[in-house]
Amino acid sequence: MILTATFICFCLASAFNYFRARRQRSLIKNLKGPFTWPLMGAMHKLLFLTPINFFQRSTEYLTKYGTFSRCWVFHRLFIPLADLELSRQLLENDTHLETGYELMKDWLVGGVLMCQSEQWQKRHSLISGLFDKGNLEQLIDLSRHQTEQLLQKLAKQADQKVFDIWYTVSPIVLDLMVMTTCGAKPSEEYSKNLKDLSEIYRKRFLSLQSANRFNYWLSSPFMRKRQNRLIKRLNDEHNNLMAMHQSQNQLKIENGLDIYQLRPIPLKDHKSLLEILLESKDPQLTGEEICGELNTCNYLGYQLCSPALCFCLVTIARNPSVQQKCLDELNLAQIKDQGWDLEKLNYLDAVLHETMRLYPPQVIVGRQLKKDFPYTHSIVGDAELPCGSEIYINLYELQRNEVRYPKANHFDAQRFLDSPPELLSYSLGPRCCPARKFSMQLLKTLLAPILANFEVLPYGDEVRLDLRLVLGSSNGFQLALKPR
């Protein structure tokens, strides 16, 4: 009796799910995809997917179903995409701007990554103000100051012994991001909270137990409580900073004080993102949204710039000719007592771009369609992707396409000097990264003195790629240093 009732319920649920998605199914008949079981869809494709086997499984999937396909999981329609033709159409479209990053909603809610499409343009303009010419120069000066601390730490490890560069580089990047956004050097507790919270979300990614919000609420109550506690601690710090800035502004108005005299960071000339958001006096910009913006920029800056720098150093170490070319360029571009002219470091810029082509820090770019998306395609024809589709662009596979990039798996910085190909690591169109120029300048500011002061040696194991929200290495970023 119980088995019969269960079977009937399963059949009814399957029928309901099928008929509810009839229109969606009719619009994607031209797309290949895995076999779809009743109710569960192609759940078997995700069941054993892990951060470590993601890249092997992804390559196998694309080989079998193509770079533009469909995959049903229960009632959800996924569109795995590694096709530049359609990716460009989607990313450059100014209507479909929803990113669909529900996993991090508790932490990054209200930030630029998750704000509504109608708010995006205004928020993008505010953040872009952080990187205008005058302020950008001050941020680069701040980066140079942090680089001095980085060199001191690296000098202690320059004994030609293998170590993981991540644990030296990432704290410096984190400090830089927080000083850029909040205008204050983070305390040890703040840094630890941000790292711990990032690690919780990294563990949740690709986990059937905790990726879904309901499953996470049900199966991981202790982790969920810890996550919420860490979010509260970070936001309490942000609220304290907001209150401090508001009181300083009041003092400045009443007593003519210079607000910058009260700032607790070594270099006081740059304007922080927090100041820009507060000075905008936008009545629609709430305290919660400001916290979300600070959390978003701190997280993205820390989690994307740190692996980019580490992958670049490991790659340079294993390509001696590339390292020598970088050194020659640094010698030519050096300014006495002022570091380097970053604009003249074209080859180093190409090395960074080629590294991010092979190892894009953000492997997956998502879009969630709120309405039908008409497209044209040279292979599958002209059609529409239905409303409700969840599109995930796989940059790792897309940027290793042999048709687009000759010898795609081979490191060749020269390709970005001759006729630079399109790079999607910073996205395209209206939702592209507003910090693109700053992040490239930051990476060059950190890389240049490292290469000038140390020979980077290819010791240790090769990186073993894994995907936990951002691209990483399961065995770290191993290399050795030798003083020049």
From Swiss-Prot:
Disulfide bonds: none annotated. Belongs to the cytochrome P450 family. GO terms for molecular function: heme binding; iron ion binding; monooxygenase activity; oxidoreductase activity, acting on paired donors, with incorporation or reduction of molecular oxygen. GO terms for cellular component: endoplasmic reticulum membrane. It comes from Drosophila melanogaster (Fruit fly). Its main location: endoplasmic reticulum. Its cofactor is heme. Pfam families: p450. Heme binds at C433. It comes from the Eukaryota. May be involved in the metabolism of insect hormones and in the breakdown of synthetic insecticides. Keywords: Endoplasmic reticulum, Heme, Iron, Membrane, Metal-binding, Microsome, Monooxygenase, Oxidoreductase. PANTHER family: CYTOCHROME P450 4C3-RELATED, CYTOCHROME P450 FAMILY 4. Signal peptide: none annotated. This is Probable cytochrome P450 316a1. Its EC number is 1.14.-.-.
